[in-house]
Amino acid sequence: MESSRLLLLLAMFVFAGGFAHALWSIRAGSWKESRWHLLPMVVGFGLQCAFLAQRGEVHGRCPLTNLPEVFVFIGWCIVLLYFLVGAAYRLSLLGVFTAPLVALLMLPGFFTPMVARPLPRELSFWEHLHAPLAMIGYAAFALACISGVMFLIQDFLLKKHKIHALFYQLPPIHHLSKAIVRMVGFGVLVLAAMMGTTFLIEEPISGAKMVLTWGVLGIYAAIWLLMLRHTLSGRLTAWLAVLGFLLPLGSLWIVA
């Protein structure tokens, strides 16, 4: 097995193992707040870094040359943003819900051959910056989606009066609502900055890619505006965050 594939396999096992252990601990009632819960995320993130560094060395640039690499890079951005925002929003279980999504995003990279493609020409600074900014924006939308899932689970448990171990560990609903709005807003701003770089790139960009990306930006900007004006209920906000993430995820398949 080639080393890059081995790194992905190890990272998937670490993320999946951390998720399984957390669920078992919550179910058994033994879950306690501890920095040790970050360990699987830190180890998995390190393995992701090693994979991306290896692929970057092969390509001689940011490893975003095929769809499997794009998915791994988005997963890496999701974990990075989790480290930055998890504590700030008091979302202690965000990592638990993040881990399976990140593991799934790495799955295509493990099963799909990733052939190194030579650069047709030297890329400009703005071209190097363009794609990573898009991935960071999409990662923010992914975290909003995960926060939305947590909100909907808690809302369901409240409505069904199923107050068990998981309910007591989930963050308060108002924390989740704030996290959704802020992550959607952050994603919109980063994606807008990315679209701004397109005016500084001399080489023509695919029309389909431009239409899809502007579409994603426009729809998320409209959703963010509705959230800021408090015209949506908390549940509808969560559903928009969850279902809305299908749009950027689907656009990656189409563009690729």
What are these regions (language model features)?
Residues 60, 122, 166:
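Glycine-rich, flexible loop/turn motifs
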Residues 153-176:
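Cytosolic, membrane-interface loops and tails of multi-pass inner-membrane proteins
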Residues 1, 62, 123, 127, ...:
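Membrane-helix interfacial "entry" motifs
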Residues 115-125:
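Interfacial non-cytosolic loop connecting adjacent transmembrane helices
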Residues 3-115, 133-154, 175-200, 208-256:
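Hydrophobic cores of alpha-helical transmembrane segments in multi-pass integral membrane proteins
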Residues 123-137:
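Surface-exposed beta-loop interaction hotspot
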